[in-house]
Amino acid sequence: VRGVPDSVKRLTLADESLIFDAVAQQTVDLVRSYISADGTGRVAIIAPDDMVKPLRRHVYEQLRETLSAKEFDRLDAQSSWDEQVTVCSTQMVKGLEYDAVMVVQPGIIEENAPSRIVAAADLYVAMTRPTQRLLIVRTNADEKLLKL
């Protein structure tokens, strides 16, 4: 995030049962702010490996319910290499930039890494991908795992 006022936001939730809905709603807000129908704008939701698939389903269900059918169909039809909305692990975003990035449960990302050096590299990659907005979404328990 390059000198944009209010570019880093944090959302801390009471428990894990709230994560999926919160991430889905925050994604809708980011899509409305950063994604254009002309194909410009990119948003990444970076999560622990075991959360990626179920989180992607939940996010896309929320997008389907919230966006116009035309806009949802346009986003849903995009190939994985050119998606405007990506739900992925840290490994998938290396070397890429996004207008907005949401990092979900960074403490778990760190905890699941095979070593401390890999954990540090993964979190560095995740948190340096956005050009305009970084949003960290986590639970109170995750915050105890890793202070940011």
Task: Tell me the role of every PLM-derived stretch.
Residues 4-9, 13:
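ASCE P-loop NTPase motor cores of helicases and related translocases
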Residues 2, 16-28, 32-135, 140-148:
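Core RecA-like ATPase module of SF1/SF2 helicases and allied nucleic-acid translocases
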